[in-house]
Amino acid sequence: MRLDQFLSARTMYSRRELRQMIQKGKVTVDGAVVRKADQAVQPEAHTVCLNGREICGDQYLYVLLHKPKGYVSSADEAGQKSVLELVPPELCRKDLRPVGRLDKDSTGMLLLTDDGQLAHQVIAARGHVAKYYHIVLARPWEDGYLQSLEQGITLADGAQCLPAKAAPVPDTDREALICLHEGKYHQVRRMFAALGNHVSELARDCNGRTCCCRLELPLGACCVLSEKDVQKLLKCETDFARFATNAPKSFVIMDKCTSRILGNKRLEKCFYFWYDIYVTGNGKRLSRGDVLENLI
């Protein structure tokens, strides 16, 4: 494969722009500057860098972005700043698109990929990929919310939501942790509107278990995920099954992810709060080390 062909398929640059960059010495192959656009490269055998950044040679690219407020999760809303603007040009492939969406005023982890099949798996409810949120409510959490969410909320337009897991954050009366397995438009906000409350702040912490527990991405930053990370995302329900069937297992995982990403000490405390009521199916209490070993 020609060098310019390889780069064209994996960046947003045109062939003409890439040839100019190659001639200016901005491209290296295995550490050596290459100035010929027709240089032969093999994605699986060579390391190609553009402007000092390694270009992913895999067929598909998976990028995890910590979305800040003020950006929309699409590329075609006129006059709006897109999350794609936060991805370095060397990583932004032509078909790179967000998987699902976070609205403009929300923050959180957003997966971007050019793998259409994986995107469908994550978005579709039948894919069973969990999505985790930390929310702040305008009014205090009410005891009846948990039962309503677990039964499935009916939205104002009549749409029926799948059952959701939820729990208030200890030592607060307006913060909660939410776990969904679907992605309707503005779903979390609409669910609490149906309950007579309002979501003031919303942050999505991760999809599934996508290596978030090992990342501390600042707002606006992104990183490339490995194929292994992506498989963790798709197998999150299998991982959950290792824990007790009668325990709030999704929140144990979510709390730990949240505290690692955001450095939120109160959510770290929430993790240990859930640990205190966390028991195995035979009634044997897990040690804190056992739980952490399974999370990381």
Which positions does each model-derived feature cover?
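Cationic, low-complexity basic patches in intrinsically disordered or flexible, solvent-exposed regions
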Residues: 250, 257, 266, 270, ...
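Basic, flexible Lys/Arg- and Gly-enriched helix-loop patches that mediate nucleic-acid binding at interfaces
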Residues: 1-243
